[in-house]
Amino acid sequence: TVIQGYALLKLPQAEATQPLPRDVVKVTFTSGTTGSPKGVLLTHQQISAVTESLIEVAQITSDDKHVCVMPLAVLLENIAGVYVLLQAGAQVLIPSADALGMQGSGMDTPQRLLSMIIQKGITTVILAPGMLEGFINVIEAGHPAPTDLRFCALGGASVSISLLNRAAALQLPVYQGYGMSECASVVCLNAVNSNHIGSVGKALPHVRITLADDGEVLIQGGGFTGYCQNFGVGRWI
């Protein structure tokens, strides 16, 4: 067929795409550590279960003030930072990368973020281990430590016990945890009144963890919907 001199190609009819379950509100992709990245389906129920548990464990109140350091595309910051604090009626600050002292994906000038935390009275923050090390180096070099900061969650990568011990020596309120995309981020977290260095803490209140006969760790809680094109894969992860 020719319309005003342009030929229209007849394309094969595409197959209908399977719609997502109606209660899915977010699709987040895994990092692909053990295979190709998969689109994880997260429901309102699953996200709410995590945020309510984190509010309880981290003792978040409307008096808290959180600063987003990680990109909002990072599920940990998205859920444990923004959603948790807003659900509790607290404040969330989203500064520019320059204001945070970020250069690319790394923290070029940690003293800039540290100064902001002090000046703005920030009470909660989420850091990767490399960011925490930058903080510690600056404070050990003589920069004042933040006095209002009461909960610094650590995630995104494994962390050495020596780094946690350095943080403890400076009386920094650092709490290590563990999570995965399929569980809407956080699964375990050290609590304010129960912080054990070298441990990822206890399972969140809505989570159940057990071991299979072969030693595999099985996690249940919040309702796992599945992946894109693979719904209803089971109750355990």
Label every PLM stretch briefly.
Residues 1-18, 118:
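Structural core segment of the AMP-binding/adenylate-forming
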Residues 1-4, 38-41, 90-98, 103-104, ...:
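Short beta-strand->loop structural element characteristic of the AMP-binding/adenylate-forming
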Residues 12-29, 36, 59-65:
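Conserved pre-ATP/AMP-binding loop-to-beta segment of ANL
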Residues 25-50:
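Conserved AMP-binding A3 loop
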Residues 45, 130-133, 157-158, 162, ...:
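Alpha-helix/helix-capping structural signal
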Residues 48-65, 72-124, 129-133, 137-138:
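Conserved AMP-binding/adenylation subdomain of ANL enzymes
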Residues 87-90, 114-115, 122-126, 136-195, ...:
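Gly/Ser/Thr-rich phosphate-binding loop
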Residues 199, 203, 212-237:
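Conserved ATP/PPi-binding loop(s) of AMP-dependent carboxylate-activating enzymes
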